[in-house]
Structure formats: structure tokens, C-alpha cells
């Protein structure tokens, strides 16, 4: 049976059929260059699978994502600078406003580093977001993962697998099918897909070429890695 995929905003916490038996593919673009993002988009477009894209910056590739069937745009705000004092923007409100200015259709949010708090959750709701994706419950926890409605009626959507967490070791490879009686949301990053990252050390060793596509592509790992699992998911 073909893999049934859908977008994050389609999840209704009180309607189990909106997520049970489905597979939710998410992508955090993390300031990657256009060629890296396009590489991942081309793979998804060819497969016909649905995906939700958490965007970090304005780029013409966003319009390409919009034009690709079954793709959803979401936001990936970075609040880290507010925590360490290095932010150009002074408040969480300005961080959100900047992103929503170029992707006003966004309904889902996952913060960079999964930064969250009760105040941020309320801000997400206030600006019109409906789905928060800032919780990782890894496969190793062996829990029955489900979405839920928060106190402010924001739908909380945890994910069970993330490529950069897998790269640090200790977690199984990405599930290729929906997990029985479990919300199955997975998270990939285009830079790891492009590099076919097999380990965090390989990724770190290539940092100096992340802005130069020809060289980056030449450093793609030959053998099992993130791209391997990504392509296997898309072939499902």
C-alpha cells in the first residue's frame, strides 16, 4: 500500500482519522542556500508526497514550494539570539512578524532549537498560528504519541524522529511507515539530505562549503546516510 502523507495543518487533535495511519514529512530549511533547498524539493515533487516546510528566511524557493502540489509553508523562528543577547530583533513579537510578513499563510510553527514557553505558545496563537511542532518524543521513548489541544486551543504536534538527532547516535533510523496507533511526524533538513550526512562529524567537517553548491555536492557521502533514508521514505 502506498504511503499516505499529509500536511501538519490537517491534523485535528480530536479527530483521530486526521492523523492515524498517515505519515507527516516535515522539512526545516535552516538558512540553507537555494540549491540545497531545491535539491530536497525536487525529490519531494517527483515523489508526489505531501510535506510541511518550516522556513527561516525570504527566498524565491518559497514560491517554488507554494507551486508544488501538496506542500505547506510554515515558520521556523529563531529565538536563540534573544536568549544569548545576540539578536538583531529585540522581541519575540518582531521575530514572528518578520517571518509572517513573507509567509502570511503559515499556520504551523517549529522554533529553531525547538524553543518554547507558555508565553511563546500564547504569542503563536495570537498571531494566528494553529499548530505548534516544538516537541520531540523520540522513538527510543517507546511512547504512544498523539496530538493534543493546549489550554489556548493550539494544536500540539510532536515528532518522533529528526535527522540531526539521529546523527548524534542512539536513535533508530527513520520509520518508513506510519507507526501503529501513533502520530508519525518526522523532520529532515535539506543540508543533511544534500550531504547524505552519515554522522555529525561528517556534517561538521563540511561547514566551510555549505554556501558553495558544487563543492558541497562533491562532498556528498557515498553509503547509507540521511539522503538514503529520505529517498526510502519518498519511495513508500
Which role fits each region the language model picked out?
Residues 1-70, 101-105, 118-130, 134-236:
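Terminal accessory/targeting
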Residues 20-29, 75-90:
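Glycine-rich phosphate-binding "P-loop"
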Residues 91-98:
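Glycine/small-residue-rich loop that forms an oxyanion/phosphate-binding "nest" at active or ligand-binding sites
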Residues 113-117:
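Gly/Ser/Thr-rich loops at beta-strand to alpha-helix junctions
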